[in-house]
Amino acid sequence: MSLFRRVGIIARLDKPQILDTVKKLMEYLQEKDIAPVLEDQLATMMPGVKVASSALKELGDHCDMVMVVGGDGSFLGAARAICNYDIPVLGINRGTLGFLTDISPHNLQEELDPIFRGEYHEEKRFMIEAKIKRQNRPSGEGIALNDLVLHPGKSARMIRFDLFIDDQFVMNQKSDGLIVATPTGSTAYALSAGGPIMLPKLDALVLVPMHPHTLSNRPIVIDANARIRIVVCESNLTYPSVSCDGQLNITAAPGDEIHITKKAGGIRLIHPKNHDFYNVCRDKLGWQSSYRP
């Protein structure tokens, strides 16, 4: 008998082939006497299908596992929505890179059978949260699995800000912004900005400057439990934004303080038993694959 009896399904909605994959997934689950629970918007895209559905934010109340059909962006959105539930998440890749979505849509049964027999690898990925204070009052907040990014928003101007770690002054920086990335996010935007790749199991964060005016400003790897404080200097003529996984933007103002910390809990990510992070890097990043001893 499967360890999972009710499986929530979240999917990207803009591609017909994704709905085809969802239908195949539902048939697979029902054949195994596992009840699928569709996210509400997905359910509206599949008229005539008689299965349970739920609002995204409440999906974790109705299932003991969630499957995401889409790419890394879909997975990130799902992670933020269900992160307060202690349920595992599995990704079926219908995107491009697919660092977080391991299962091929072309081999569903072959790749899912072992997982529903309990033959899988599970790892915990932590998340981070940002809280913006304006004149010591809350102004906005957001969470991220990949990264929180301070950027100019709609303006092409550089930003000047002060950076503090655990209340110790680090630097005053003038740049296009700052990426604060988790190990999960180290292979995303932070990597393209010159940051290092971090193993997913590391309890660390990387701070990556974006086009700093001082060329000696380099990425810094810090303890994941450190308290980061960014003060947007009063001299700025623009209102920068804080982006959460590139999907949610919060506007900051000159004088605002941005507090970034590790979020309690996290995401339980399911991988196939043979999952290998270095193999994923070779495949997704185009590393040389031949071994020459």
Swiss-Prot record:
Its cofactor is a divalent metal cation. NAD(+) binds at residues 72-73, 146-147, 157, 174, 176, 187-192, 247. One of its GO terms (cellular component) is cytoplasm. It is found in: Cytoplasm. Keywords: ATP-binding, Cytoplasm, Kinase, NAD, NADP, Nucleotide-binding, Transferase. One of its GO terms (molecular function) is NAD binding. It catalyses: NAD(+) + ATP = ADP + NADP(+) + H(+). It comes from the Bacteria. One of its GO terms (biological process) is NAD metabolic process. SUPFAM superfamilies: NAD kinase/diacylglycerol kinase-like. Involved in the regulation of the intracellular balance of NAD and NADP, and is a key enzyme in the biosynthesis of NADP. Catalyzes specifically the phosphorylation on 2'-hydroxyl of the adenosine moiety of NAD to yield NADP. The gene is nadK. The active site is at 72 (proton acceptor). Belongs to the NAD kinase family. It is an enzyme of class 2 (transferase). This is NAD kinase. Gene3D superfamilies: Probable inorganic polyphosphate/atp-NAD kinase, domain 1, Probable inorganic polyphosphate/atp-NAD kinase, domain 2. Its EC number is 2.7.1.23. InterPro entries: ATP-NAD_kinase_N, ATP-NAD_kinase_PpnK-typ_C, NAD/diacylglycerol_kinase_sf, NADK.
